[in-house]
Amino acid sequence: MGMMEEFKEFAVKGNVVDLAVGVIIGGAFGKIVTSFVSDIVMPPLGLIMGKVNFTDLFINLSGKPFDSLKAAKDAGAPVISYGVFINTLIDFIIIAFVIFMVIKQINRFKKEPAPAPPNTKECPHCLSAVPIKATKCAFCTSDIK
């Protein structure tokens, strides 16, 4: 089998295609959650906390005063952007929770596999486990029905 045939077989396998679709949908879902956090969750939270815009929260490490995170970054000042980190953390928590709920629902619909039929039975004389088709116990040599 040539390299092209091997690649074609690999590329069209169900798992590869499923993975590609999952990555694309996951990327789009991440953008939706980021927008949800930035545009819907954080503004009311910032208002409750005294009109704080979390994306502008930072610690200035340069010692020079800056009015905003953008001004500090434009000046090349070293900063710790903990407000952006808070937004990212909330994004992660929401995504993790949604994925947990989706997987929980998917697992609810999965059918449990039927239990395997027993392949041994108990000898009524010595109580040892013997193969289901056995007519004589290998341990005590008693006849088994």
From Swiss-Prot:
Q: Where in the cell is it found?
A: Cell inner membrane
Amino-acid biosynthesis among keywords: no
Q: Does the keyword Manganese apply?
A: no
Family matches, as Gene3D superfamilies: Large-conductance mechanosensitive channel, MscL, domain 1
Q: Name one Pfam family in it.
A: MscL
Q: What are the TM regions of this chain, as residue ranges?
A: 16-36, 83-103
Query: Record's GO cellular component, any one?
Result: plasma membrane
Q: Name one GO molecular function term.
A: mechanosensitive monoatomic ion channel activity
Q: Write down the membrane topology.
A: Multi-pass membrane protein
Which UniProt keywords are listed? Cell inner membrane, Cell membrane, Ion channel, Ion transport, Membrane, Transmembrane, Transmembrane helix, Transport
* Similarity-based family: Belongs to the MscL family.
Record function comment: Channel that opens in response to stretch forces in the membrane lipid bilayer. May participate in the regulation of osmotic pressure changes within the cell.
Listed under subunit, the entry gives: Homopentamer.
The molecule here is called Large-conductance mechanosensitive channel
Write down the species. Answer: Geobacter metallireducens (strain ATCC 53774 / DSM 7210 / GS-15)
Q: What gene is behind this protein?
A: mscL
